[in-house]
C-alpha cells in the first residue's frame, strides 16, 4: 500500500512544509477471497492457536542514505520501535528490534531498484518485518507496504515489508507526519488491514471490519469530526488506518485486532 504527499510549496530535501496523504496502490486482486481461503485451510490446531499472550514480531530496520541525507540516529530508530509498540499494544502486537543496518547508496535512497535493494538487505523470514527508511521515495510517497500472501514464493518473501520515508520517524522533519505513525499505518497492511475508508467513494464495508463505520472518503488533516456515511456512526478519523495527521491518530479497534490475529495465523505464523 502506498502513501504519497502532495506538496503545496517548496521544501528542503527530505522535509515537507505542507502535505496531504494520498494512496497510489490497492490490495491484490481478489484479496479477500485469498484471505478467507487461507483461513479456512488452517489446521484445527493452527486456527485455534492461543494468541492471548500477543504476537511478537522480529523486526529489522534498514536506513538508506545518500551521503548524510536520510541518516537516522539509533535514538530515533528506537523511538520508532517504541511508538509502534505503544500503538499496537491495543491490538496485542509488539515489535522486537533484532538489527538495524545503514547503507549509503544514492540509487536506493531515491527509491529506485527496490528489488535489488531488498535482495541485498532483506533479513529474517516471512514472519519477520523489514522496514526500509528511504529519504526520497518516488512521487513524494510517505510509505509503501505489501499485504501478506498465501504460499509466498522466495521472491515474494524478499519483496515483503515496508518502505517508509525517513522524515516520518518520531522527531523527523516531515511536518504533520513525524510521530512515527506512517510506519504504524504501513505495518497495518503487512498485518492484513485495509484502509478504513472506501477506495471508490461508496458507503460499503470497505475494510471488512464490523466495528469501523462505513466511510466514503479519506480524512485530511485533523478535523473535530467527520461523517461521510450518515446513519452508521461517524468516520474513524482517529484510526491508524485512515489518512489523518499523525497527531490525530490514536486507535485500532477490537475488530481490527481480531483481523490482525486471523491474518497472522493464516499467512505469517510459522513461516
UniProtKB/Swiss-Prot annotation:
Class of the enzyme per the UniProt entry, highest EC level: hydrolase
Biological process, per Gene Ontology: proteolysis
GO cellular component, one term: extracellular region
InterPro entries assigned: MetalloPept_cat_dom_sf, Peptidase_M43
Positions annotated as active site in the UniProt record: 186
PROSITE patterns registered for this protein in UniProt: ZINC_PROTEASE (PS00142)
Keywords: Disulfide bond, Glycoprotein, Hydrolase, Metal-binding, Metalloprotease, Protease, Secreted, Signal, Virulence, Zinc
Gene Ontology molecular-function annotations: metal ion binding; metallopeptidase activity
Highest taxon listed in the record's lineage: Eukaryota
EC number(s) reported in the record: 3.4.24.-
Glycosylation (residues): 136, 200
Residue sites binding Zn(2+) per the record: 185, 189
Family annotation (Pfam families): Peptidase_M43
Protease in keyword set: yes
Role according to the record: Secreted metalloproteinase that allows assimilation of proteinaceous substrates. Plays a pivotal role as a pathogenicity determinant during infections and contributes to the ability of the pathogen to persist within the mammalian host.
Family, similarity comment: Belongs to the peptidase M43B family.
Protein name (database record): Extracellular metalloprotease TRV_06892
Species annotation: Trichophyton verrucosum (strain HKI 0517)
Amino acid at each position: 500500500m502506498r502513501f504519497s504527499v502532495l506538496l503545496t510549496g517548496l521544501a528542503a530535501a527530505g522535509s515537507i512544509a505542507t502535505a496531504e496523504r494520498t494512496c497510489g496502490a490497492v490490495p491484490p486482486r481478489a484479496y479477500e477471497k485469498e484471505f478467507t481461503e487461507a483461513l479456512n485451510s488452517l489446521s484445527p490446531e493452527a486456527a485455534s492457536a492461543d494468541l492471548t499472550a500477543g504476537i511478537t514480531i522480529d523486526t529489522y530496520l534498514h536506513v538508506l542514505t545518500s551521503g548524510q541525507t536520510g541518516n537516522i540516529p539509533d535514538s530515533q530508530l528506537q523511538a520508532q520501535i517504541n511508538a509502534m509498540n505503544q500503538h499496537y499494544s491495543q491490538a496485542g502486537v509488539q515489535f522486537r528490534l533484532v538489527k538495524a543496518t545503514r547503507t549509503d547508496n544514492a540509487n536506493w535512497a531515491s527509491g529506485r531498484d527496490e528489488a535489488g535493494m531488498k535482495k541485498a538487505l532483506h533479513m529474517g523470514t516471512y514472519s519477520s518485518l523489514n522496514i526500509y527508511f528511504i529519504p526520497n521515495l518516488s512521487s513524494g510517497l510517505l510509505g509503501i507496504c505489501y499485504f501478506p500472501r498465501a504460499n509466498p514464493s522466495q521472491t515474494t518473501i524478499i519483496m515483503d515489508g515496508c518502505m517508509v520515508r525517513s522524515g516520518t520517524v518520531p522527531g523527523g522533519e516531515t511536518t504533520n507526519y513525524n510521530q512515527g505513525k506512517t510506519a504504524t499505518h504501513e505495518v497495518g497492511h503487512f498485518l492484513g488491514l485495509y484502509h478504513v475508508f472506501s477506495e471508490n467513494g461508496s458507503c460499503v464495508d470497505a475494510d471488512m471490519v464490523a466495528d469501523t463505520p462505513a466511510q466514503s472518503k479519506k480524512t485530511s488533516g485533523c478535523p473535530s469530526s467527520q461523517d461521510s456515511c450518515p446513519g452508521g456512526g461517524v468516520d474513524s478519523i482517529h484510526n491508524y488506518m485512515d489518512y489523518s495527521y499523525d497527531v490525530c491518530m490514536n486507535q485500532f479497534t477490537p475488530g481490527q485486532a481480531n483481523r490482525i490475529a486471523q491474518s497472522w495465523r493464516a499467512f505469517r505464523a510459522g513461516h
